[in-house]
From Swiss-Prot:
Protein name: NADH-quinone oxidoreductase subunit D
GO molecular function ontology, one term from the record: NADH:ubiquinone reductase (non-electrogenic) activity
Name of the encoding gene: nuoD
SUPFAM superfamilies found in the cross-reference section: HydB/Nqo4-like (SSF56762)
Family: Belongs to the complex I 49 kDa subunit family.
E.C. number(s) listed in UniProt: 7.1.1.-
Domain of life of the source: Bacteria
Length: 438
């Protein structure tokens, strides 16, 4: 594209764009179709999953070049972690990939525990609850992927189904942690608090209802001619391309490779759970859709096993240099700390109060060293590289977010295809910009 044939248009209907190009190229002759136009899709666009900017060079209806513009949701989380204690860091990392907060928290806490060398001291009950919450979170995240992907292709019913079912999962999260998102519930050494009364029954109700709701979603889309026409063969990326770009998650498993960190590098006791790794050989958007639906079914199986494994016991490591002296719980009026918590800290001894004050304000010290820990998030390998200089704050924390890595496949999956298929290709990647920009 030469410098004299650059057309800048914004906020117009597509027909207006085409007319402007034809008018500029000499009255609508055949040469108009040969011109290449650069179009900005986003960052404010209903089909780009947040503030993602796609720079598309198109010739007619064909995409000749596709690039990503990121950084519109940069929040400086990794830098902020260097100015907070190890425990306070959980409050930040849970806000990165905001659709799968429990995975952010678990990856971070597993890294801190590895540096402290207390991985084996985390109580079994805490690990079981972590797995249960992560798998419920996988379901809620995949439901958003299917709902938004369906909406962008015109399947409004799929969007309604997806968000309706997600509400059921978020109700469970709200009951257990007090929040629908950004929980900060998982802490280094265990959990912030135990399951409330009635939580297990609430999860069992969800397990009874969800399989039927997932079948409704499958009946709606699996054999739908329009859905298959818009997704089969779209966003194609084979195993060679995935390996070259470092792609993980459903995109990689859609090539037929059963790569799942829960199986290859088990954490939180995943080796003790029975589940299958979902794969497909389509290498396209339709295959990724099938994998996400199948993964939700497998997650339900894992959650059921978690409920069977739940045994009474502590939910925090016993090391008093790490664990707070008492569980923080609300008072009977819903405000302030409970009388039991205050009594535990203040009535026992002055030393206990001093210890609690120092532990909360200054934080615990972590031995110098560095670790890399990874978990299997709904989008792929979520890794954390953590460096400690022996202080009460991290020296450096870097996250390998799967959305960031997987977005590098945009050029490979979109170039040479049609403009309309860019929407389906990006939706099948399922990027979350909070994790990309951090």
């Amino acid at each position: 594209m030469s410098e004299d044939t650059v057309f800048t248009v914004a906020g117009q209907d597509w027909d207006d764009v085409v007319d402007a190009v034809k008018a500029s190229s000499g009255g609508g002759g055949s040469e108009g179709g040969e011109e290449r136009i650069v179009v900005n899709m986003g960052p404010q666009h209903p089909s780009t999953h947040g503030v993602l900017r796609l720079i598309l060079e198109i010739e007619g209806e064909t995409v000749t070049e596709a690039r990503c513009g990121i950084g519109y949701l940069h929040t400086g989380i990794e830098k902020n972690l260097e100015y907070r204690t190890w425990t306070q860091g959980v409050t930040f990392v849970t806000r990165m990939d905001y659709l799968s907060p429990f995975f952010n928290e678990t990856a971070y806490c597993l890294g801190v525990e590895k540096l402290l060398d207390i991985t084996d001291e985390v109580p079994e009950r805490a690990s079981v609850i972590r797995v249960m919450l992560m798998e419920l979170n996988r379901i809620s995240s995949h439901l958003v992927a299917l709902a938004t992907g369906g909406m962008e292709l015109g399947a409004v019913t799929a969007m309604l189904f997806g968000f309706r079912e997600r509400e059921l999962v978020l109700d469970v999260f709200e009951m257990i942690t007090g929040l629908r998102m950004n929980h900060a519930y998982i802490r280094p050494g265990g959990l912030s608090q135990d399951l409330p009364e009635g939580a297990v029954e609430k999860v069992r109700e969800l397990l009874a209802l969800m399989p039927e709701r997932l079948r409704d979603m499958e009946n709606l889309l699996n054999d739908n001619r329009i859905w298959k026409g818009r997704t089969q063969g779209i966003g194609y990326l084979d195993l060679t391309g995935c390996m070259a770009l470092g792609i993980t998650g459903p995109m990689l498993r859609a090539t037929g490779l059963p790569h799942d960190l829960r199986k290859s590098q088990p954490y939180c006791g995943y080796e003790n759970y029975e589940f299958d790794v979902s794969t497909d050989t389509g290498c396209d958007a339709y295959g990724r859709y099938l994998i996400r639906v199948d993964e939700m079914k497998e997650s339900l199986k894992i959650v059921e096993q978690c409920l069977d494994k739940l045994r009474p016991g502590p939910i925090m490591a016993e090391d008093k240099k790490i664990a707070w002296p008492a569980d923080l719980t609300l008072g009977p009026d819903g405000l302030g700390n409970s009388p039991g918590h205050v009594r535990e800290i203040m009535d026992s001894s002055m030393e206990s109060l001093i210890h609690h004050f120092k532990l909360v304000t200054e934080g615990f010290r972590v031995p110098p060293g560095q670790v890399y820990v990874a978990v299997e998030s709904p989008r792929g390998e979520l890794g954390v590289h953590m460096v400690s200089d022996g202080g009460t704050r991290p020296f450096r924390v870097h996250f390998r977010d799967p959305s960031f890595t997987n977005l590098q496949s945009v050029a490979a999956t979109c170039e040479g295809g049609m403009v309309a298929d860019v929407i389906a290709a990006v939706a099948s990647i399922d990027p979350v910009m909070g994790g990309v920009d951090r």
